[in-house]
Amino acid sequence: MPPRIAIPIPHSGDPEYAERSLPQYERAVELVGAEPVRIPLDKSPATVMKLIERCDAVLLPGSKADVDPAKYDAERHPKTAPADPKRDTVDELLLQDAYNMRKPVLGICYGLQSLNVYRKGTLVQHIGSAVNHAAGRKVPIAHSVQIDAGSKLASVVNSPQSPFVISVNSSHHQAAEVIGDGLRVVAKCPEDGVIEALEGTSPDHFVLAVQWHPERSTEDEPSRAIFRSLVEAARARHEKLSGEFESV
């Protein structure tokens, strides 16, 4: 049975945006042998939890919203987009379950920001940089990312371009600032120092988040490898739990 990956609907207020972006995430996990499970934003917490409990891992996708700055005790920047409280609530349920049950987590773009705030981190609400971090879908390569050599991400990506450097797309205007509990910075944009990836510090819990959109470039091995790492972590967790059950 393939691992089931919980993916929340990206945005509660824009069905067209959600239906345009969500299939890319679903296809990305299907390509590496997993089953995507859509998590609705308009159901009761009890209904959502029943779906979440059936899943083996979590993928937090991007969104056109911004995390409510009140969640990290900040005043709203004039360029901060409206929040999506329904998405925030579902993300919190997903992350609470993932941390309680040690389920693997992958955050992408908004998903990185949501994860960091959940772990009591803060965000840069609007990046002031000459680098075009908000390049969007029409720009396949926006800038490069330098990955820490000793990180899990470096071992996952194994970049052929040059050691621990990859070229990425980019569709964000916010970034992690103060890093949340149990997370560490593992990649930055070398041109301006903007944080581009985080991962968990616990060796027995797979947590990875990237600021770019690997689901848009799954024909490239570094992008596909990111999703493969999530699925492999989900399989490893399942095998470990099965072994513990059999030994009882």
Spans of features found by a protein language model:
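Conserved G/P- and acidic residue-centered "switch" motifs that form tight phosphate/ATP-binding loops
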Residues: 109
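Hydrophobic, aromatic-enriched interface-forming segments
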Residues: 112-114
